[in-house]
Design a protein with these regions (language model features):
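Beta-strand/loop-rich accessory regions of lumenal/periplasmic or secreted enzymes
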Residues: 1-153
C-alpha cells in the first residue's frame, strides 16, 4: 500500500510448491537505476551475516559503492539506503540483504535466510530450517521511503 506521505509498504506471503525439502532464501528483488551508486545499511557488517554465523559482524552503519567488496554478500539489516548526491530511498527491513558485484543495481531484500553450512556440516536445528513441506507460507514485508522523507526522520 502507498500512504499519503509516499511511503510504500510491501507485505507478501509465499506458499512454496517445489520438490525440494528446504529453500535457501525467501524475499523480493529490487532493481535500481545505475545512478544510485551508494549503498548503506544499519545492521551487521562489514562481513557476511547468516542466522548461525554472526560472530565476526559488528552492529553499525556500513556502506560503500554498489557492487564493491565493501557491500557485497549477505548482510543482516534494519534499514538499507541507495542514493547519490541528489536523490535516493531507504528500505526499512528487519531481515537480510544480499548484494552481488556482478549486478550492482540489484538488491535482494530477504525475510528468511537458510543457515550457512560450515566445514561440511549443516546448520543445527536452532536455526530456522525453511522447510517447504509444512503447508505454511513464508511471510515478509518491508517499507520504502523516498529521500525527502529521510531528511525528516
Amino acid at each position: 500500500s502507498i500512504g499519503v506521505d509516499g511511503r510504500l509498504d510491501v507485505n507478501y506471503e509465499i506458499l512454496t510448491d517445489v520438490a525440494i525439502p528446504q529453500i535457501p532464501i525467501v524475499g523480493m528483488t529490487i532493481k535500481t537505476v545505475p545512478e544510485l551508486k551508494e549503498l548503506h545499511w544499519l545492521g551487521l557488517g562489514p562481513y557476511d551475516a547468516y542466522p548461525n554465523k554472526k560472530a565476526a559482524s559488528i552492529l553499525g552503519v556500513w556502506g560503500g559503492e554498489a557492487g564493491s567488496a565493501d557491500v557485497t554478500g549477505m548482510k543482516a539489516t534494519r534499514w538499507i539506503e541507495r542514493s547519490n548526491s541528489e536523490c535516493g530511498f531507504r528500505i526499512m527491513s528487519n531481515g537480510y540483504m544480499k548484494h552481488d558485484a556482478s549486478h550492482p543495481e540489484i538488491m535482494h531484500i530477504l525475510s528468511y535466510v537458510f543457515g550457512r553450512p560450515e566445514k561440511g556440516r549443516q546448520a543445527d536445528e536452532s536455526v530456522p530450517q525453511m522447510r517447504t513441506d509444512t503447508g505454511v507460507p513464508f511471510v515478509g514485508g518491508f517499507s520504502i521511503l523516498l529521500n525527502a522523507d529521510l531528511q525528516k526522520k
